[in-house]
């Protein structure tokens, strides 16, 4: 494992080295890029992630089989959820496909960018976790839950070690999906390019990690879209 840390950067998902050297590093190691502040942090699609000093912003760079690329987003959410449960006795709620909430307020988000070359994928998994600040109205921080400020560098090192250890473990899709369904929030509307903005019934995450919904008395499986 390698880690690079910045005081400030546009985004931890930015390229900091040439792609050939990047591939060499990822041949045998994961690369973690962290910054205490992001100037242009991004979420899913064109969304911006407010990134003031006091929270954790990092990107995990990995080389995986191309077939694992889709799953990684969900697995990282699962790992972060487990971290909060084990270390703080906090059971977060899961919002498909890549956010974690507590009492309807967002505390963490995951966004993945991938480059697929043949059977290999190079993944940049961005993670934002509200630790000492909750930068938007509908968000919450760890400080807001436990009423205690955290040292960002110390806590991020603990989280990275937890993630790195967890990534060495095998977990079946069945177990992952069962876990996600257990904690999934189901009271969102759908914003989707095909189905539009409709009131839906969220049923479950399928084993292929699509979302099963009910719309106009019809069951649909969607692989992308936004819950709002």
Could you describe each region identified by the protein language model?
Residues 42-44, 95, 220:
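Basic side chains
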Residues 31, 91-95:
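A short coil-to-beta-strand element that immediately follows conserved catalytic motifs
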Residues 1-86:
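N-terminal lobe of the biotin/lipoate ligase/transferase fold
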Residues 3-5, 14, 24, 65-68, ...:
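Long, positively charged amphipathic alpha-helical accessory segments at protein N-termini or as interdomain linkers
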């Amino acid at each position: 494992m390698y880690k690079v840390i910045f005081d400030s950067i546009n985004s931890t998902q930015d390229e900091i080295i040439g792609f050939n050297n990047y591939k060499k590093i990822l041949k045998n190691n994961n690369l973690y890029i962290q910054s205490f502040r992001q100037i242009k942090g991004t979420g899913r699609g064109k969304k911006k992630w407010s990134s003031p000093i006091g929270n954790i912003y990092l990107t995990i760079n990995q080389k995986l089989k191309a077939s694992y690329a889709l799953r990684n987003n969900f697995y990282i959410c699962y790992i972060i959820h487990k971290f909060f449960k084990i270390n703080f006795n906090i059971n977060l709620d899961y919002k498909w496909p890549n956010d974690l909430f507590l009492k309807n307020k967002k505390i963490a988000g995951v966004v993945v960018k991938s480059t697929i070359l043949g059977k290999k994928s190079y993944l940049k998994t961005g993670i934002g976790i509200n630790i000492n600040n909750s930068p938007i109205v509908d968000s919450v921080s760890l400080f807001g839950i436990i009423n205690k400020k955290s040292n960002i560098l110390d806590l991020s090192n603990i989280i990275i070690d937890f993630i790195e250890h967890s990534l060495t473990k095998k977990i079946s899709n069945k177990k992952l999906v069962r876990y996600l369904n257990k904690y999934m929030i189901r009271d969102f509307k759908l914003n989707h390019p095909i189905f539009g903005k409709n009131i839906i019934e969220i049923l479950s995450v399928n084993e292929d990690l699509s979302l099963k919904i009910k719309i106009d008395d019809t069951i649909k499986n969607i692989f992308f879209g936004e819950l709002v």
